[in-house]
Structure formats: structure tokens, C-alpha cells
Curated annotation (Swiss-Prot):
UniProt keyword terms in alphabetical order: DNA damage, DNA repair, Nucleus, Phosphoprotein
Location of this chain's protein in the cell: Nucleus; Nucleus, Nucleoplasm
Annotated stretches, region: Disordered: 90-155, 180-275
Taxonomic lineage of the native organism: Eukaryota, Metazoa, Chordata, Craniata, Vertebrata
Name of the protein in question: MRN complex-interacting protein
InterPro entries linked to this entry: MRNIP, MRNIP_N
Motif (Nuclear localization signal (NLS)) on chain: 142-145
Family, per entry: Belongs to the MRNIP family.
Function summary: Plays a role in the cellular response to DNA damage and the maintenance of genome stability through its association with the MRN damage-sensing complex. Promotes chromatin loading and activity of the MRN complex to facilitate subsequent ATM-mediated DNA damage response signaling and DNA repair.
Molecular function terms from GO: chromatin binding
Disulfide cysteine pairs (residue numbers): none
Low complexity bias (residue ranges): 183-195
UniProt xrefs under PANTHER family: MRN COMPLEX-INTERACTING PROTEIN
Length: 395
């Protein structure tokens, strides 16, 4: 029996080929190797006849493929030539089409003419868009509107009225402020230490203030336990008044007391600028004598046993302050301090309290007996007073 062959075509590579006839309906392409089913036969017969037929079919397919490629190339060349010619002939038309806005189809070109476009261009040339000019113009307009709205007049009148109103308020406020300052400073009853720095109008009420007189301040002396409630200047003024008005009492014994000073110094009145004011109402003036040499500042005493040793001395400024601090208690005032002193062993002493050594110098000057040349005593020097007579205050 003779073997049969058939001519088939691959669906992927489109080539014709010879395949042996089989019972199965599946075959595989010898060129691309794609497995596919049998759909169409282009010939059946002997092997030699099938090969000649396949060669003819493939040759025809190749020629047709070349024609198709040539046609495609020819069409591409013609299109390129046409484009080049179009660009050379109409370059202006393309530029105009490119410059045309896409919004032109939505606008009415019939209403707009060439004259209107020229007018718009002229207006655009005269417009300035600088920011500083716009800011200045806007602020000026706003200021004018804000100034004209409240009063409805000119801007100058408004500013003048504002200036006058502000001056009136300042003038009305100044007297109130001065009254507050003056009332706060003078109601305290004391002159402030900053009174020299105030205005001349504020210093005027100082003449109306009532300051304590010298007689009122002399009535009470500061003690060690008393506390000062006044200001600094009042306390200094009271001390100066006490120093100037009070003079320590001296007994008749001072007539016989020789007071010597090797180096006389400036008196305390000249040193501190005080004035001597005597209390004429005192009942002790008839028993006291003022020695002109009491203005000497320092006192000293020399012993007579050949040793020149200095006994504690005092100053007149110290006697004024220390006298009240070192005196006897208040219950001994009725009969007088001098009445309570007694001579014990040639020295006077206070019966109730013993005075410290600092008060010795003070009472030595006040109640010192007549100094007699005698050997130096080992006893401490205490205030001495020779008489036991009581002073009658009623006389």
C-alpha cells in the first residue's frame, strides 16, 4: 500500500509544509514548533507531488509579502514628502493657528472689531500696577473717610479739636494729682525727707503745718527704754532741741571747784551749731550758777600723789544724752536726786542704784566737792555732794 501525504499551513508562521497523514487530528509545525489541530488541507498525494506544490505556494507567499512591504514603504515616503511640501508652502497659516486661543470659539467675534482692540491696547499702556502707589492711595482715602465720619468737618479741624481736648484733660488732671500728693505727705504730721525734691507748688503747704515747739519737746526726755515713732528728721530735731534747751545743773560747790583744761577746744554749741536756750520757768535756776568756762569740751583731773594719771573725762554732748539714761529711778524725783545722796566715807552714793563707771564723769562735773591736796584714794570716784539740806520747791 502506498503512504499518503498532505499539505498544511501553520497559523503562526503562515508557512506551507508537507505532513504525513495520521489518525490523530493534531500536528506540529516543523518551522516554529507550534502544536495545532488539523483544520484545512491544501493538497494530498505522493510525497514528490506534495513537495513541488509546497515550493510553489511558499514562493507565491514570499512575492506577495515583498509587494506588501514595498507598498507600505511607498506610502510612507509619499506622506513624508507631502508634509515637507505643506510646511514650505504655508508657514504663516500654521503660526496663526498656533496663536489662536482655544477660548475664541466661545467668544463672539462679530461684536469685537479692530478699532476696539486698539482702544484696549491704549488703555493697557496707561495702566500702572506698582504696589506702593496703590498702598499710599488706599491709606489716604481711608484716613479721610475715618476723620470725616465722626464730626462731618475737615480733617484739620478734627485734629485741632482732638489736640485741645487732650490738653484740657491734662490740665484738669494736674491739680487733682497735686492735691493727692500734698494730702498724702502732710496728713502724716511730719515733713518728708524728699520735700526738697518736690515742685514749688507742693512746698507751699509746709508753712501751714504745725510742728512741735521746743517747749513741748523739752517736757519729756528720751529714755533707754523708749522707742521713737517719728521720722528721722523729727528725731534729730528733738535731740538738737533737747541739747540746746537743757543745761546740766551745777551746785554752789562749783564756785570752789577749779576746772582746768590744758588744750581748750571748740565748744559743743559752736561745733554743732546749737543756740543756748535757758528754761526760765525752772525753779532750780536760783541754785545753779553757770560758769563761763563750761564751754570747754574736755575735763580732766590729775591726782596729787605724783602720778599723772587721767581720770575718765566726758564731753558736753555726751552729758546731755547720758544724763537721763543714768539718773536714779523716777520714784526719787519727789524730794530731788540731790536730797537722796549721802556722804559715805567721803564719797557720795545713790542709796537705791549704783551708777556705772560711765556716769561717774558726768556727776563729777555736776556734784564734785572741793578738791583738796590729799593722797590718792583707792576708792572709785563717785559723785560727791557735801550738804544734807533739802531744797524746798515751794520757795
Amino acid at each position: 500500500m502506498v503512504q499518503e501525504f498532505n499539505v498544511l499551513r501553520c497559523f503562526s508562521c503562515q508557512t506551507f509544509q508537507v505532513q504525513q497523514v495520521k489518525k490523530a487530528k493534531k500536528w506540529t509545525c516543523k518551522v516554529c514548533g507550534e502544536k495545532q489541530s488539523l483544520i484545512k488541507e491544501f493538497g494530498r498525494g505522493a510525497a514528490a507531488d506534495c513537495r513541488r506544490h509546497v515550493q510553489k505556494l511558499n514562493a507565491l507567499r514570499g512575492e506577495q509579502h515583498q509587494l506588501n512591504t514595498q507598498q507600505l514603504l511607498a506610502q510612507g515616503d509619499e506622506e513624508n514628502e507631502n508634509e515637507d511640501v505643506y510646511e514650505v508652502l504655508d508657514p504663516k497659516s500654521e503660526q496663526e493657528e498656533a496663536h489662536v486661543s482655544r477660548w475664541s470659539k466661545y467668544t463672539d467675534q462679530t461684536t469685537e472689531g479692530p478699532n476696539e482692540e486698539k482702544d484696549d491696547e491704549d488703555e493697557d499702556e496707561n495702566v500702572y500696577t506698582e504696589r506702593p502707589q496703590f498702598r499710599i492711595q488706599g491709606t489716604r482715602k481711608r484716613k479721610k473717610m475715618s476723620s470725616l465720619e465722626p464730626f462731618g468737618g475737615n480733617c484739620d479741624n478734627y485734629e485741632e479739636s482732638r489736640a485741645g481736648y487732650s490738653q484740657f484733660r491734662k490740665q484738669a488732671y494736674l491739680p487733682l494729682q497735686l492735691e493727692k500728693r500734698s494730702s498724702s505727705s502732710w496728713n502724716k504730721g511730719s515733713v518728708s525727707k524728699y520735700s526738697n525734691c518736690q515742685r514749688p507748688d507742693d512746698v507751699v503747704p509746709s508753712a501751714r503745718t504745725k510742728l512741735p515747739s521746743s517747749r513741748q519737746t523739752v517736757g519729756h526726755y528720751p529714755t533707754a527704754c523708749s522707742s521713737s515713732t517719728n521720722t528721722m528728721e523729727n528725731s534729730i530735731g528733738n535731740k538738737q532741741q533737747i541739747k540746746s534747751s537743757y543745761r546740766p545743773p551745777t551746785a554752789d560747790v562749783n564756785k570752789h571747784l577749779p576746772i582746768q583744761s590744758e588744750s581748750p577746744s571748740v565748744s559743743s554749741h559752736q561745733k554743732f551749731g546749737e543756740s543756748t536756750i535757758e528754761n526760765k520757768d525752772s525753779k532750780w535756776n536760783k541754785f545753779l550758777t553757770i560758769v563761763p568756762t563750761q564751754d570747754k569740751e574736755e575735763y580732766y583731773y590729775e591726782s596729787q600723789n605724783g602720778k599723772k594719771t587721767l581720770i575718765p573725762y566726758f564731753t558736753k554732748a555726751d552729758t546731755v544724752v547720758d544724763f537721763e539714761e543714768r539718773r536714779c529711778p523716777a520714784d526719787e524725783k519727789d524730794s530731788g536726786i540731790l536730797n537722796r545722796q549721802k556722804v559715805v566715807g567721803g564719797n557720795a552714793s545713790c542709796p537705791t542704784t549704783r551708777l556705772p563707771t560711765k556716769s561717774v564723769g558726768f556727776e563729777n562735773a555736776v556734784c564734785k566737792p572741793v578738791l583738796v591736796k590729799a593722797p590718792y584714794s583707792s576708792l572709785s570716784l563717785n559723785p560727791l555732794f557735801c550738804t544734807d539740806e533739802d531744797f524746798d520747791d515751794t520757795s
